[in-house]
């Protein structure tokens, strides 16, 4: 059986995936790869511009290709885009190649984090009902994909990172 030596962080936009994956990368001494950053590099465009010009379907296709390419290399921390779980193909890739950590966040926490960001293609502060519906539709996908779930509520990035490290040790002891 193939070892799941990549660690993929998943969760809704605003869950803290980018900040926490950066810190986790530093603490574990593993390179950090962001699916969104790889897409922006390949396309030469920002994520919001790709959504606007080419649509979500095109973006999701690019995201799948990037995830496949990233998973060709071992021992990485992968910062996944919030919607990566929406394609079954991506879930299969992650299950084969990654230990998946779901950063679970409460809707009110997400809303507070997102309301000041203008570069979120699927979020607008005036449409929190849309965010709630989107989150609700993705929750079962996040939970199903996760090997480990860590709540981010009322925790600093360092606290979440420590909890992930503890969970990784427990996971390795029970699965190895």
UniProtKB/Swiss-Prot annotation:
Substrate binds at residues 36, 60, 82, 138. One of its GO terms (cellular component) is cytosol. The keyword Aminoacyl-tRNA synthetase does not apply. Its cofactor is Mg(2+). It is found in: Cytoplasm. Pathway: Metabolic intermediate biosynthesis; chorismate biosynthesis; chorismate from D-erythrose 4-phosphate and phosphoenolpyruvate: step 5/7. Keywords: Amino-acid biosynthesis, Aromatic amino acid biosynthesis, ATP-binding, Cytoplasm, Kinase, Magnesium, Metal-binding, Nucleotide-binding, Transferase. Gene3D superfamilies: P-loop containing nucleotide triphosphate hydrolases (3.40.50.300). CDD domains: SK. Binds 1 Mg(2+) ion per subunit. It catalyses: shikimate + ATP = 3-phosphoshikimate + ADP + H(+). Mg(2+) binds at residue 18. ATP binds at residues 14-19, 120. Its EC number is 2.7.1.71. Pfam families: SKI. Monomer. Catalyzes the specific phosphorylation of the 3-hydroxyl group of shikimic acid using ATP as a cosubstrate. Belongs to the shikimate kinase family. PANTHER family: SHIKIMATE KINASE, SHIKIMATE KINASE 1, CHLOROPLASTIC. This is Shikimate kinase. It comes from Dehalococcoides mccartyi (strain ATCC BAA-2100 / JCM 16839 / KCTC 5957 / BAV1). The gene is aroK.
